[in-house]
Amino acid sequence: MPDGSVVRTGTNYSGKFQEAHDASKASIQNRISNLESGGVKGTGEGPVKVNYGEQYAREKRKKILKPNVEYTSKEGYTYTTDSQGRVASCEGSLQLGDGKRNNYAQRVVGGNDRLDDDDGGHLIATIFKGSGNMDNLVPMNSNLNRGEWKKLENEWANALNDGDKVRVKITPNYSGNSKRPDSFVIRYKIGDEDRWRLKNFDNVPGGKLDE
């Protein structure tokens, strides 16, 4: 499979997830190509690099992420935001440790677009020293977050404990102006692997995983 390619087969959708799934399916390849070329969706230009801590702005006294910026945490995880200040990508080499949680940020991330059964999901888990703040959080279905996503994190943690390196690239995909991703593309390498492994999750119970 070519690097970054996505294959989806045999998944049946109904109800409120159908529209979001269709929009996501149509846009994933464009999204990946845009990010790999250094662009930010909706601008045609690359993100502006800022120092970690400078990725925030204030809107009516509320902290938000700046649009079209790139920031790197002290742990070495690099993120970009899109033209609407949503986390558009994150990547880095994982390291085991204890990140600090922000329970308030986890409860409110996504605002009005958040669903009742969502968690504040960490793109880089706290067990990998991921930030507990909005710069590393998205609204994520709780069953996905605690199920298939957690299984993947456990696979990475086990590899690190075995002495292997783990590198990840995570791309949330959004529809319209929503701050809630409707799907995720996750690519990762373990050890000295040449090719990226690929996981696709839809932001629904069970992740509707296609492999």
Question: Where are the model-predicted features located?
Answer:
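Low-complexity, glycine/serine/proline-rich disordered segments
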Residues: M1-S89, G99-N102, Q106, G110-N112, ...
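Domain-level detector of nuclease and nuclease-like folds
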Residues: V69-E211
